[in-house]
UniProtKB/Swiss-Prot annotation:
Subunit structure, as described in the record: Homohexamer; trimer of dimers.
Residues at which substrate binds: L83, C84, H85, M121, E122
Active-site annotation: D136
Top enzyme class: lyase
Pathway where it operates: Cofactor biosynthesis; molybdopterin biosynthesis
Protein's recorded name: Cyclic pyranopterin monophosphate synthase
Organism encoding this protein: Rhodospirillum rubrum (strain ATCC 11170 / ATH 1.1.1 / DSM 467 / LMG 4362 / NCIMB 8255 / S1)
Keywords: Lyase, Molybdenum cofactor biosynthesis
Reactions it catalyzes: (8S)-3',8-cyclo-7,8-dihydroguanosine 5'-triphosphate = cyclic pyranopterin phosphate + diphosphate
GO process terms (BP): Mo-molybdopterin cofactor biosynthetic process
Enzyme Commission numbers on file: 4.6.1.17
Length: 166
């Protein structure tokens, strides 16, 4: 077994001492329960949000399709983000909630597993892919939509323990 690559002087773990990109060796880490929650929004025109809520768009049920896309995105994260480990996810939940007071859809994704590395990237990817799917399905009526505030909300497990966004 090789030793995990040490972090660089500035704490980055995906580079070796020569500055080359590496996938971190997690073989020596303990398996723990790990959960990550990420969130984000798709801001849009009021008429676009109304069409989503009323299922009035030609491409179909935007929220259901985006929910499935987010789940698929979490599962495909290591295919999209080069240094992510392939993980045996035990849970992926994606929620899309219309927010008419702010003309947006709020997206939340929760990913979980028992393993040696966290699921933050999977949760973030789920939110991003769900948001991109909302955009794709609505772009014919609103090209000015914006994906905003994609961020990690919380994570538990692993050596660093629990973290919650302030």
């Amino acid at each position: 077994m090789t030793d995990p690559a040490p972090a660089t002087a500035d704490g980055l773990t995906h580079f070796d001492t020569a500055g080359n990109a590496v996938m971190v060796d997690v073989s020596a880490k303990d398996e723990t329960e790990r959960v990550a929650v990420a969130g984000g929004c798709v801001e849009m025109a009021p008429a676009t949000l109304r069409a989503i809520i009323e299922r009035g768009l030609k491409k179909g049920d935007v929220l259901s399709v985006a929910q499935l896309a987010g789940i698929m995105g979490a599962k495909r994260t290591p295919d999209l983000i080069p240094l992510c480990h392939p993980l045996a996810l035990t849970k992926v939940a994606v929620e899309l909630t219309p927010d008419p007071d702010h003309d947006r859809v709020v997206i939340t994704a929760t990913c979980a597993l028992r393993g040696r590395t966290g699921v933050e990237m999977e949760a973030l990817t789920a939110v991003a892919v769900a948001g991109l799917t909302v955009y794709d399905m609505c772009k014919a009526v609103d090209k000015g939509m914006r994906l905003t505030d994609i961020r990690l909300l919380s994570k538990t497990g692993g050596k660093s323990g629990t973290w919650t966004a302030s």
